[in-house]
């Protein structure tokens, strides 16, 4: 092959940087050449529309994940608060009952009921 032998010679083969410059300059010319063509603009509008849809999907997905985390965290904190409240109220009721039993602060008919309930005493 006469062309292959000529261009395979070291002095005639361009180096990587020169080939990169040539390729990018040719590509840029092609881009500018086709930039105002109707099919190119339509294609760009479709791509922009697809990017917009993908962005909205991503945002919707991530915002729903953060909303679920917020809801889950809020429920957990609410349950924790109510649990502590009921436990502390139960403890407070037990202490109050013990104090009133010691000081005979209950009417006599209540004493029977309270003394039978060992959890409060």
From Swiss-Prot:
Subcellular location, record wording: Plastid, Chloroplast stroma
What domain of life does the UniProt record list for this protein's source?
A: Eukaryota
Task: Select a single GO molecular function from the record's annotations and give it.
Answer: ATP binding
Q: What is the recorded name of this protein?
A: Protein Ycf2
The answer on whether this UniProt entry bears the keyword Iron-sulfur reads no
Which organism does this sequence originate in?
Vicia faba
> What are the annotated GO cellular component locations?
chloroplast stroma
> Which UniProt keywords are present, listed alphabetically?
ATP-binding, Chloroplast, Nucleotide-binding, Plastid
Protein purpose: Probable ATPase of unknown function. Its presence in a non-photosynthetic plant (Epifagus virginiana) and experiments in tobacco indicate that it has an essential function which is probably not related to photosynthesis.
In the record, the note on similarity to other proteins reads: Belongs to the Ycf2 family.
Q: Which interval of the chain is the signal sequence?
A: none
